[in-house]
A protein has these predicted regions:
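Beta-strand-rich domain onsets/edges
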Residues: 11-30, 114-177, 181-190, 198-203
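Exposed beta-strand face motif in extracellular beta-rich ectodomains
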Residues: 82-86
Length: 216
């Protein structure tokens, strides 16, 4: 089973870090694909440094930047021999999206449960059409080498999920737990959209809300 948790994406397509092997056997490289699409179906993006603000992995407390070449597919292909949990983190450079009508943006804010967005928009004196949005994309994934022991941590992204469950060593009968952060604080009572993919590739989407401590 593969889970993707999402809270902010102002466009129809999501971005996620994927892999053909989240538990690669000994001697094989850890390969991470940068995917863009919907419901786990999408294009495998090439690596371009002008689209990447930061791209790194951490294992056993040691951080390493991904040093891919322009146009590389997959975006990350690294030989990692040490055992343990590998946390891969990606942040894009900013992109600009123009809305020519309010309706398209309204669909987004309704879907993402931002009820105060219109009031905030108009109170700033912004127009209801022809306005622009700047957005970043953030994505993390967990890979296991060998025993897969280890834990996720907060890397200081503007918004991020921090896994509180290690899916490779913890009992998943109790579920997978994560904590959502925005800035330096847990984000409470936020809608979380979850995409769940089973081993056969079937995808189910459902919604949860974070608690008072940002946990879901």
């Amino acid at each position: 089973m593969f889970l993707k948790l999402q809270i902010i994406s102002a466009h129809a397509h999501e971005l996620w870090l994927d892999s053909k092997q989240f538990q690669p056997p000994e001697g094989e490289k850890v390969e991470i694909e940068l995917r863009n699409g919907q419901n786990f179906k999408g294009i495998n993006l090439s690596y371009f440094n002008n689209r990447t603000k930061q791209f790194f992995w951490m294992q056993n407390g040691a951080r390493q930047d991904v040093r891919s070449r322009l146009g590389d597919v997959p975006a990350m292909s690294v030989a990692i021999d040490d055992e343990g949990l590998i946390v891969v983190v990606y942040e894009s450079t900013p992109s600009i999206l123009t809305y020519n009508s309010w309706e398209k943006f309204a669909n987004f804010i309704n879907h993402k449960d931002f009820p105060d967005a219109k009031n905030s928009h108009t109170n700033r004196g912004l127009p209801l059409k022809g306005f622009k949005e700047q957005y970043h994309r953030y994505s993390k994934t967990l890979v296991a080498r060998g025993h897969g022991k280890g834990s996720d941590r907060n890397f200081g992204l503007e918004t991020e999920f921090v896994a509180q469950t290690n899916p490779y060593v913890d009992d998943l009968e109790a579920g997978f737990r994560a904590q959502l952060w925005y800035g330096k604080k847990p984000r409470k009572n936020a809608q979380v959209e979850i995409f769940e993919r089973d081993p056969e590739g079937a995808v189910v989407t459902f919604y949860l809300r974070t608690d008072l401590h940002g946990r879901v």
